[in-house]
Amino acid sequence: MRIAGVNLPLNKHAVIALTHVYGIGKTTAKTILQRTGIAPDRKISDLNDAEAHSIRELIAEEYKVEGQARGEQQLSIKRLMDVGCYRGLRHRRSLPVRGQNTQTNARTRKGKRKTVAGKKKAARK
Protein backbone atom coordinates (compact mmCIF):
# COMPACT_ATOMS: atom_id res chain seq x y z
CA MET A 1 0.00 0.00 0.00
CA ARG A 2 1.32 3.43 -0.96
CA ILE A 3 0.66 6.63 0.96
CA ALA A 4 2.24 9.95 -0.06
CA GLY A 5 4.61 8.12 -2.42
CA VAL A 6 5.89 5.73 0.26
CA ASN A 7 5.43 1.96 0.20
CA LEU A 8 4.19 0.94 3.65
CA PRO A 9 5.36 -2.42 5.04
CA LEU A 10 2.41 -4.81 4.82
CA ASN A 11 3.41 -7.02 7.76
CA LYS A 12 3.40 -4.21 10.38
CA HIS A 13 0.62 -2.72 12.47
CA ALA A 14 -1.01 0.36 10.99
CA VAL A 15 0.37 2.72 13.67
CA ILE A 16 3.96 1.66 13.06
CA ALA A 17 3.61 1.45 9.27
CA LEU A 18 2.31 5.03 9.02
CA THR A 19 5.45 6.31 10.78
CA HIS A 20 7.44 5.29 7.68
CA VAL A 21 5.99 8.40 6.02
CA TYR A 22 8.18 11.46 6.70
CA GLY A 23 6.24 13.91 8.85
CA ILE A 24 4.07 11.30 10.60
CA GLY A 25 5.13 10.11 14.04
CA LYS A 26 3.41 7.72 16.41
CA THR A 27 1.07 10.32 17.90
CA THR A 28 -0.03 11.60 14.49
CA ALA A 29 -0.48 8.03 13.24
CA LYS A 30 -2.72 7.22 16.23
CA THR A 31 -4.78 10.37 15.59
CA ILE A 32 -5.19 9.52 11.89
CA LEU A 33 -6.34 5.98 12.66
CA GLN A 34 -8.71 7.18 15.38
CA ARG A 35 -10.31 9.73 13.04
CA THR A 36 -10.72 7.15 10.27
CA GLY A 37 -12.11 4.57 12.70
CA ILE A 38 -9.42 1.95 12.12
CA ALA A 39 -7.97 -0.10 14.98
CA PRO A 40 -4.27 0.75 15.52
CA ASP A 41 -3.28 -2.91 15.91
CA ARG A 42 -4.60 -3.96 12.48
CA LYS A 43 -1.98 -4.93 9.93
CA ILE A 44 -1.67 -2.90 6.75
CA SER A 45 -2.26 -6.05 4.69
CA ASP A 46 -5.68 -6.47 6.40
CA LEU A 47 -6.97 -3.02 5.40
CA ASN A 48 -9.50 -2.89 2.56
CA ASP A 49 -9.47 -0.33 -0.27
CA ALA A 50 -12.04 1.96 1.37
CA GLU A 51 -10.01 2.20 4.60
CA ALA A 52 -6.78 2.81 2.69
CA HIS A 53 -8.52 5.52 0.66
CA SER A 54 -9.84 7.24 3.81
CA ILE A 55 -6.33 7.30 5.31
CA ARG A 56 -4.88 8.70 2.06
CA GLU A 57 -7.54 11.42 1.85
CA LEU A 58 -7.13 12.51 5.47
CA ILE A 59 -3.35 12.75 5.13
CA ALA A 60 -3.58 14.65 1.82
CA GLU A 61 -6.09 17.16 3.20
CA GLU A 62 -4.74 17.90 6.66
CA TYR A 63 -1.07 16.94 7.01
CA LYS A 64 2.18 18.11 5.47
CA VAL A 65 4.20 15.00 4.67
CA GLU A 66 7.25 13.92 2.68
CA GLY A 67 8.50 16.65 0.30
CA GLN A 68 6.22 19.33 1.67
CA ALA A 69 7.40 18.74 5.27
CA ARG A 70 11.06 18.56 4.23
CA GLY A 71 10.74 21.76 2.20
CA GLU A 72 9.10 23.60 5.08
CA GLN A 73 11.90 22.51 7.42
CA GLN A 74 14.55 23.69 4.94
CA LEU A 75 12.79 27.05 4.56
CA SER A 76 12.64 27.60 8.31
CA ILE A 77 16.37 26.83 8.63
CA LYS A 78 17.12 29.16 5.71
CA ARG A 79 15.03 31.89 7.37
CA LEU A 80 17.07 31.55 10.58
CA MET A 81 20.29 31.85 8.57
CA ASP A 82 19.03 34.90 6.62
CA VAL A 83 17.91 36.69 9.79
CA GLY A 84 21.39 36.13 11.23
CA CYS A 85 20.25 34.97 14.66
CA TYR A 86 22.41 32.73 16.84
CA ARG A 87 20.63 29.54 15.73
CA GLY A 88 21.10 30.56 12.10
CA LEU A 89 24.83 31.10 12.62
CA ARG A 90 25.17 27.67 14.24
CA HIS A 91 23.41 26.10 11.24
CA ARG A 92 25.65 28.01 8.83
CA ARG A 93 28.81 26.83 10.62
CA SER A 94 27.56 23.22 10.90
CA LEU A 95 27.75 23.26 14.68
CA PRO A 96 25.21 22.00 17.25
CA VAL A 97 22.26 24.39 17.48
CA ARG A 98 20.83 23.50 20.89
CA GLY A 99 23.67 24.38 23.24
CA GLN A 100 25.61 21.11 23.34
CA ASN A 101 29.32 21.08 24.17
CA THR A 102 31.67 21.15 21.20
CA GLN A 103 35.16 20.93 22.70
CA THR A 104 35.25 17.13 22.71
CA ASN A 105 32.00 15.91 21.17
CA ALA A 106 29.64 17.02 18.35
CA ARG A 107 31.40 14.81 15.80
CA THR A 108 28.17 14.03 13.94
CA ARG A 109 27.46 17.70 13.28
CA LYS A 110 31.06 18.80 12.69
CA GLY A 111 31.98 15.89 10.43
CA LYS A 112 35.19 13.92 10.30
CA ARG A 113 38.16 15.26 12.26
CA LYS A 114 40.44 17.70 10.46
CA THR A 115 43.97 16.96 11.62
CA VAL A 116 46.01 19.98 12.61
CA ALA A 117 49.80 19.61 12.60
CA GLY A 118 51.40 19.83 16.05
CA LYS A 119 54.22 22.19 16.95
CA LYS A 120 57.56 20.81 15.77
CA LYS A 121 60.28 20.50 18.41
CA ALA A 122 63.60 22.20 17.71
CA ALA A 123 66.42 19.73 17.01
CA ARG A 124 69.13 19.62 19.73
CA LYS A 125 72.78 19.88 18.77
From Swiss-Prot:
Coiled coil, from the record: none
InterPro entries reported in the protein's UniProt record: Rbsml_uS13_C, Ribosomal_uS13, Ribosomal_uS13-like_H2TH, Ribosomal_uS13_bac-type, Ribosomal_uS13_CS
Stretch list, region Disordered: 91-125
SUPFAM superfamilies hit by this protein: S13-like H2TH domain (SSF46946)
GO terms assigned for molecular function: rRNA binding; structural constituent of ribosome; tRNA binding
Gene Ontology terms describing biological process: translation
Domain of life: Bacteria
Alphabetically ordered keywords of this record: Ribonucleoprotein, Ribosomal protein, RNA-binding, rRNA-binding, tRNA-binding
Biased composition (Basic residues): 107-125
Subunit structure, interactors included: Part of the 30S ribosomal subunit. Forms a loose heterodimer with protein S19. Forms two bridges to the 50S subunit in the 70S ribosome.
Similarity remark: Belongs to the universal ribosomal protein uS13 family.
Role of this protein: Located at the top of the head of the 30S subunit, it contacts several helices of the 16S rRNA. In the 70S ribosome it contacts the 23S rRNA (bridge B1a) and protein L5 of the 50S subunit (bridge B1b), connecting the 2 subunits; these bridges are implicated in subunit movement. Contacts the tRNAs in the A and P-sites.
Protein name as it appears in the record: Small ribosomal subunit protein uS13
Organism: Chlorobium phaeovibrioides (strain DSM 265 / 1930)
